[in-house]
Swiss-Prot record:
GO terms for molecular function: rRNA binding; structural constituent of ribosome; tRNA binding. This is Large ribosomal subunit protein uL5. The gene is rplE. GO terms for biological process: translation. It comes from Lactobacillus helveticus (strain DPC 4571). PANTHER family: 60S RIBOSOMAL PROTEIN L11-RELATED. Part of the 50S ribosomal subunit; part of the 5S rRNA/L5/L18/L25 subcomplex. Contacts the 5S rRNA and the P site tRNA. Forms a bridge to the 30S subunit in the 70S ribosome. This is one of the proteins that bind and probably mediate the attachment of the 5S RNA into the large ribosomal subunit, where it forms part of the central protuberance. In the 70S ribosome it contacts protein S13 of the 30S subunit (bridge B1b), connecting the 2 subunits; this bridge is implicated in subunit movement. Contacts the P site tRNA; the 5S rRNA and some of its associated proteins might help stabilize positioning of ribosome-bound tRNAs. Signal peptide: none annotated. Belongs to the universal ribosomal protein uL5 family.
């Protein structure tokens, strides 16, 4: 069974975008390609257990096993060597992607303290949107009592839109709460 947002895209979002931007072909209509979750764990250099906790939390949040990211080059000031594990990332596609986006928009973002909407300035000029979350506790899957320290994560929503305006309209149609 397809995800709720996937159905919503086919029935409402795609036709609305086609009408607003006057696309000639259905292949021109922007859609969400993937969502990438990245958690940088800088203190994993001194304590590898911190990375394991981050991987476990990212697994709970995303529903799939993260890829551990390695340092590309050595930096002496950070006591960092090339090839050391310093973070974790997950790429979501398909139904998992739509399920995560639904959860993010309707459950997790409203749990952020003093939430007034996400920034409209976080588009990259090519139709992709980046969102930073300061603490992982906004996700329901994370048990508050088992968290040793709060960690932030980056959420990148990659779309097939050519412009930021198209991507903003796509995410607005999905219900992304942009700040006024």
């Amino acid at each position: 069974m397809a995800s709720y947002l996937a159905e919503e895209y086919k029935e409402k979002v795609a036709p609305a975008l086609a009408e607003k931007f006057d696309y000639k072909s259905s292949m021109q209509i922007p859609k969400i390609d993937k969502i990438v979750l990245n958690m940088g764990v800088g203190d994993a250099v001194s304590n590898a257990k911190n990375l394991d906790e981050a991987v476990e939390e990212l697994t709970l949040i995303s529903g799939q096993k993260p890829l551990i990211t390695k340092a590309k080059k050595s930096i002496a000031n950070f006591r960092l060597r090339e090839g050391m594990s310093i973070g974790a990332k997950v790429t979501l596609r398909g139904d998992r992607m739509y399920d995560f986006l639904y959860k993010l928009i309707n459950v997790s973002l409203p749990r952020v303290r003093d939430f007034r909407g996400v920034s409209t300035r976080s588009f990259d000029g090519r139709g992709n949107y980046t969102l930073g979350v300061k603490e992982q506790l906004i996700f329901l899957e994370i048990d508050f009592d088992k968290v040793n320290r709060t960690r932030g994560l980056d959420i990148v929503i990659v779309t097939t839109a050519n412009t930021d305006e198209e991507a903003r309209e796509l995410l607005t149609q999905f219900g992304m709460p942009f700040a006024r």
